[in-house]
Amino acid sequence: MAVKTYEAGVKDYRQTYWAPEYVPLDSDILACFKITPQPGVDREEAAAAVAAESSTGTWTTVWTDLLTDMDYYKGRAYRIEDVPGDDTCFYAFVAYPIDLFEEGSVVNVFTSLVGNVFGFKAVRALRLEDVRFPLAYVKTCNGPPHGIQVERDKMNKYGRPMLGCTIKPKLGLSAKNYGRAVYECLRGGLDFTKDDENVNSQPFIAWRDRFLFVADAIHTAEAETGERKGHYLNVTAPSPEEMYERAEFAKELNMPIIMHDFLTGGFCANTGLARWCRKNGVLLHIHRAMHAVVDRNPHHGIHFRVLAKALRLSGGDHLHTGTVVGKLEGDRAATQGWVDLLRESFVPEDAGRGIFFDQDWGSMPGVFAVASGGIHVWHMPALLAIFGDDAIFQFGGGTLGHPWGNAAGAAANRVALEACVEARNEGRDLEREGKDILTNAAKDSPELKIALETWKEIKFEFDTVDKLDVVNR
């Protein structure tokens, strides 16, 4: 064993943290960063600096390095790759020993990987593109409270995606009128309705009143339709204590599902709530409010695929993923990539979808992908083709904006979905034949016919800001 000696002073990061010969261990946590270095900082030094500042390093040599095994604990930048079509930045791959992170703590992982290093002066911009969580770490995490199959069993819904609706206007309704809208949507044929992400406990809709009126709506709709129904009651609150109080009250009302804003609420609160949901048999819907602040800039922040992985580890049965076809940002290949990362047991590296590493989830349950944001009945064929069955198509204006009212909007959604599922099962090409499928179904559904006429001109044809830049690696 080499004798450790201490030499005070500052040395290049590459001397300690650049290790191109390193072969990552199966137990390492691997990260891919997109780095835009400051002028005059070369790639190897910038990559090594990121590895250092996100693991054991600081700006100068310290004598306490001698008190531990730095060679074991340090992060290592082990590979650099070009970003296709952009010579101002590059990809740096960093390996971290698993012992750097607390077991089952997404909070601790993010504190290191996206902590102070993102303010480091040596880099002009920094983005965490992907993380490989080793199976050894996955097994320490709580994961989804129930998962896809258990939810299907609880809700008695099989062979198709589920349908939801976010109640609008998102703010301003009284609890009584809110409950009325919930009832009409569920009675019309939807499986779920939803609180908008910013519905918490405002003066006009105190949370307890909302819960009571919603519970009455759900129980009435279930009795009249013979179907299991649910509403995502948002329990996000100013403090964990209040969050759990709201969750407990939802359970007392026999509500099947609650909701949390996982980014604004925080990973600590989310992990705790997911554990509570598993213990108490309550499903957990997750909204991603604030995500675009973090993930939309293609050069700085955290890619959504990383946030999706983190949510699966922290815990949630549903997660909003974008729609590809609606009003929100979402590249098709990238979206299908992170949808697979939410649902599948193993997802291989796939440059064409922006997936930088193999990801093995072991037996961790999957998460329903929620397609929400500017969708209507004309989108149904594409939604089913893109997302498949293990998804929730979450309408808002596409239900509540129907000329004949909420129940008619829900009926139109249900008829459109069932027509597309039947056509898919017959082997028809949904995206090529979608118009014919819907117009034929509308012959027996006046609600769908009016919906198709109402939204026939509505499109959201804006270019994607965060495009895949990984083509061939």
From Swiss-Prot:
Alphabetized UniProt keyword annotations: Calvin cycle, Carbon dioxide fixation, Lyase, Magnesium, Metal-binding, Monooxygenase, Oxidoreductase
GO biological process terms on file: reductive pentose-phosphate cycle
Domain of life assignment: Bacteria
Its taxonomic path starts at: Bacteria, Pseudomonadati, Pseudomonadota, Acidithiobacillia, Acidithiobacillales
Record gene name: cbbL1
Q: Where is this site: Transition state stabilizer?
A: 327
N6-carboxylysine (modified residue): where?
Answer: 194
Q: What is this protein called?
A: Ribulose bisphosphate carboxylase large chain 1
Q: Where does Mg(2+) bind?
A: 194, 196-197
Q: Which family does it belong to?
A: Belongs to the RuBisCO large chain family. Type I subfamily.
Pfam families from the UniProt entry:
RuBisCO_large, RuBisCO_large_N
Q: One MF term in GO for this entry?
A: monooxygenase activity
Give the residues the record marks as binding substrate.
Answer: 116, 166, 170, 288, 320, 372
Task: Give the cofactor binding note.
Answer: Binds 1 Mg(2+) ion per subunit.
What does the annotation say about its assembly with partners?
Heterohexadecamer of 8 large chains and 8 small chains.
Q: Which residues form the active site?
A: 168 (proton acceptor), 287 (proton acceptor)
What this chain does, per the record? RuBisCO catalyzes two reactions: the carboxylation of D-ribulose 1,5-bisphosphate, the primary event in carbon dioxide fixation, as well as the oxidative fragmentation of the pentose substrate. Both reactions occur simultaneously and in competition at the same active site.
This protein's cofactor list reads: Mg(2+)
The catalytic activity of this protein is classed by the Enzyme Commission as 4.1.1.39
Q: What else is known?
A: The basic functional RuBisCO is composed of a large chain homodimer in a 'head-to-tail' conformation. In form I RuBisCO this homodimer is arranged in a barrel-like tetramer with the small subunits forming a tetrameric 'cap' on each end of the 'barrel'.
UniProt xrefs under PANTHER family: RIBULOSE BISPHOSPHATE CARBOXYLASE (PTHR42704), RIBULOSE BISPHOSPHATE CARBOXYLASE LARGE CHAIN (PTHR42704:SF17)
